[in-house]
Structures are given as structure tokens and as C-alpha cells.
Amino acid sequence: MERIVVTLGERSYPITIASGLFNEPASFLPLKSGEQVMLVTSETLAPLYLDKVRGVLEQAGVNVDSVILPDGEQYKSLAVLDTVFTALLQKPHGRDTTLVALGGGVVGDLTGFAAASYQRGVRFIQVPTTLLSQVDSSVGGKTAVNHPLGKNMIGAFYQPASVVVDLDCLKTLPPRELASGLAEVIKYGIILDGAFFNWLEENLDALLRLDGPAMAYCIRRCCELKAEVVAADERETGLRALLNLGHTFGHAIEAEMGYGNWLHGEAVAAGMVMAARTSERLGQFSSAETQRIITLLTRAGLPVNGPREMSAQAYLPHMLRDKKVLAGEMRLILPLAIGKSKVRSGVSHELVLNAIADCQSA
């Protein structure tokens, strides 16, 4: 069992990583006997894990209600968020309740925002079931829903009480979802840890076949890196922005193509290549390093070009609504070397459009 602590003073919390955690009531600490829980999950995951998690919580003496949400990024919306509030109020649940997010990034982000908002804030626990949510979205307290004009535009920074990563969940993950998660894994190597990127080049095949020790190390290393960044910059005023490599481009793809048509990791993968091409055009990054990124993403089964039907010009309106924009100016996360990156502003729109076009025509 691996245990990592996100160090945030009185709001610090553990990330527990192991197989078989859904069999152990202690996995869901700080929940105690007599407490009330609203378990939030999705239509796909409910048949797989709802009864199991409910059973282990009830074994610990916890009173469990549940709400099942529709699947897909398009349902990470204010309308679906309202169904969670309605379920909480109908029971009813008070300020002493705990929300448990059992699912991928959509369930985790939406449940976290519900917890941040319900009666001005209640406790919640992240139980991520996809690789993407295990290595990224469940850690760090970013919670949100989407708006038709932009992804994650309505939300809050709100930390969970704990994160429970049961590696056995990956056995039921569709291959496309596994690949999507690997995009965020590869991101950590590009922005922060060149040695980890090298390890991924050597061990990607083991990850694709869900080799236990390789996957446990991979998730642990990603969570360590994320925990270090969040501890240093919880509210994304500096260092934490680096975790958005590829996201400014990727969010544009998701919004333009319709949420759910491109998985988040797929859009981020193409966006990371666009960021690398932008850095190349600025003379800050070598084409050989870009090719290493492209090769690893391709081996993972991820796209390295944007949608053919989306023109370079179509990216700009979305990118100019990005949350990192300051004084109307885009701020891009650009790689300087494998394992090193920076936030860059003042890049001309023409250069960015040319970098996007490089990826459209490749």
C-alpha cells in the first residue's frame, strides 16, 4: 500500500493507493460509524462498484444514500449538479454529511463542486476509478462544471478529506479511457520529471497491459508530483499552472467539437503537441524532443493532431476565454526540455495559429 500526503496545513489529506481497498472499511477514513454519506456515481459504474462500496461503508456503520448520474463530459453541467442538490435535500442531508465521489473525472469534479456549494461546504472523499482521475483530477481540489462557452468555467478550489485509489478499478477500464489517462501521465514527465518520461518510454507496454507493479509506481509518481505542486501553489497563482500543459489547446478542441466527442486526455494529447510546436517556433524546444513526445503519445494510442474539421482559427475564441488569460492575453504552458516547462505570455496569435496548423497538416 502506498500513502502520499497532500500537505496543506489543517486541510492536508492522504492519497491511499493499493489493490483491494474497496474490501476494507478503513480505506474510507475519516468516515465513522453513525455518519451519513451521499454516494455519487455514474450509470456505467453503478453496476460495477456501487453495491460493493455501499456494503463496505455499511459494514463500518455508515448510513449510505446514493445518486446515479448519466455518463459523459456533456453531463458535467449545472443541470446535472442540481440533481445532486435535490437528492441531498430530499433525504435530507445536513452540514455533517459526506459526499463520496465514486467515478472518473466528471463524477469527481461535479461531486466536489456540489460539496463545496451545498450548505456552504460539506466534506467529500474522492474515489477515482479511471487512470486519468487517479493520477490527476482527484488530487488538488479543483472542482467544476462546464458551460457551453467553456470547460470548467464554474467551480471552486475545494480539497477532499481523502483520496482512495483502488488499482483494481483499472481492470474494468475501456482501452480508450486507459489511453486518455496516459496523456495526463505523460504530461507529468514533460513538464516536471525527465527521468519519469524516460521510464515511461521504457515501460509503456507494461502500463498498457495493466502490469501491477508498473501501474502502482506510475500512479504513485504522478500523485507525488501533483501533491508537491499543489502544496506549493494550491490556487494556481504560479507553479501549478504548469499542470495545464496542452489544456489551453485541448479545452478548445473539447468545446468546439462538443463535450464527450473527444475524451479529455485525447484533446490534451493533441494540445501538448501543439504546445511543443509553439515552443519550437519560439526557438525554445527542439524538434527531436517534440518527436519523442509524438512517439510516446502514438504508442499510447493517442491523437497527435487536432480534428481535421476544426480550423486553426476556430481555436482562438476558446483559447482567449481560458482561465489563465490575464488582461486579455493568452498565457501558454510551453516545454523548454523534456522535464522542464514554463508559463509564457505575449506569444503572437499568428505564431500560435501556425503551430496549430503544423499539427493539422501533419
Curated annotation (Swiss-Prot):
The lineage of its organism: Bacteria, Pseudomonadati, Pseudomonadota, Gammaproteobacteria, Enterobacterales. GO terms for cellular component: cytoplasm. Catalyzes the conversion of 3-deoxy-D-arabino-heptulosonate 7-phosphate (DAHP) to dehydroquinate (DHQ). Coiled coil: none annotated. The gene is aroB. It catalyses: 7-phospho-2-dehydro-3-deoxy-D-arabino-heptonate = 3-dehydroquinate + phosphate. GO terms for molecular function: 3-dehydroquinate synthase activity; metal ion binding; nucleotide binding. It comes from Shigella flexneri. The keyword Nucleotide-binding applies. Its cofactor is NAD(+); Co(2+); Zn(2+). This is 3-dehydroquinate synthase. SUPFAM superfamilies: Dehydroquinate synthase-like (SSF56796).
